[in-house]
C-alpha cells in the first residue's frame, strides 16, 4: 500500500501548510455545457523515491498545464506523480477529481494511506486498485502517462485498448516508461494513431487536447461482447 512518504513534509495531511488559497469559484457556475470540458487523467507512479527531485516539478507542471489549458484533471487519488500533478493543478485554481480504491474517506486515508488534499471531488469506488484503475481510465477523455510501474502500464493498456487518446511524457534518462511503452506499441502489431509523445508538459497537453477534440467527432458505443464500435 502507498504511504505519505512521497509527500513534501509541508504537504502531509494535517499540515497547516497543506491548504491551498485558490477560490473554488470555478466550481460554481451555471454553464449547462460543463460536461464538454475535457477530462485529462494523469497516470504515474505512486512512489517517486526512485526518481530525481526534478520530477516533482515536472509533475506539478503537468497539472498546471491541464488547468491553464482549460481541462479538468483526473487521477487515482493517490500519492506520487499524480498527487504532485494535482498540486500543480490547484496552484492554477483548476479542478482536481480523484477515483479512490477505497469505499470511503476513512478507509482511503487510514487503510490505503492515501491523501485527501488537492482533491475537489473523490469518487470512492470500493473496488481496490484494479477496479479503481478501470473506472479512472474510462472516466477520462484522455490520459497523460508519466513515470510509472505496473499500475501505470495497466492503465495505459486499458486506454490503448479502448482507443482513449494518450499523451506519453518523454524523459531524458530520468525514467524509462516512455521507452517501454514505445516498445510495447511496436511489438503489439496494433497501430494506434491516438498516442502522442513529448518531453514538454505544455506541448503534450496541447497535443492531447487536439486528439480529444478529434476523438469527440466519433461516438463510442460499448456492446455486450465488449467490442468497441465507432459511429460517425
Predicted features, each with a name:
Residues 122-127, 192-204:
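Short acidic-hydrophobic, aromatic-tinged amphipathic segments that line or gate anion-handling sites
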Amino acid at each position: 500500500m502507498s504511504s505519505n512518504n512521497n509527500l513534501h513534509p509541508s504537504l502531509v495531511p494535517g499540515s497547516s501548510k497543506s491548504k491551498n488559497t485558490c477560490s473554488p469559484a470555478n466550481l460554481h457556475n451555471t454553464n449547462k455545457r460543463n460536461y464538454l470540458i475535457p477530462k485529462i487523467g494523469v497516470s504515474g507512479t505512486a512512489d517517486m523515491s526512485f526518481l530525481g527531485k526534478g520530477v516533482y516539478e515536472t509533475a506539478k507542471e503537468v497539472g498546471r498545464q491541464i488547468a491553464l489549458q482549460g481541462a479538468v484533471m483526473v487521477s487515482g487519488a493517490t500519492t506520487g506523480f499524480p498527487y504532485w500533478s494535482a498540486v500543480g493543478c490547484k496552484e492554477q485554481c483548476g479542478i482536481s477529481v480523484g477515483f479512490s480504491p477505497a469505499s470511503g474517506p476513512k478507509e482511503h486515508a487510514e487503510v490505503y494511506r492515501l491523501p485527501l488534499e488537492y482533491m475537489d471531488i473523490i469518487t470512492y469506488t470500493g473496488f481496490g486498485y484494479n477496479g479503481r484503475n478501470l473506472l479512472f481510465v474510462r472516466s477520462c477523455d484522455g490520459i497523460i502517462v508519466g513515470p510509472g510501474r505496473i499500475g501505470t502500464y495497466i492503465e495505459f493498456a486499458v486506454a490503448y485498448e479502448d482507443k482513449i487518446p494518450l499523451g506519453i511524457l518523454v524523459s531524458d534518462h530520468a525514467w524509462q516508461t516512455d521507452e517501454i511503452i514505445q516498445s510495447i506499441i511496436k511489438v503489439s502489431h496494433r497501430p494506434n494513431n491516438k498516442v502522442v509523445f513529448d518531453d514538454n508538459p505544455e506541448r503534450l497537453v496541447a497535443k492531447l487536447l487536439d486528439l480529444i477534440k478529434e476523438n469527440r467527432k466519433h461516438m463510442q458505443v460499448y456492446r455486450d461482447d465488449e467490442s468497441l464500435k465507432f459511429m460517425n
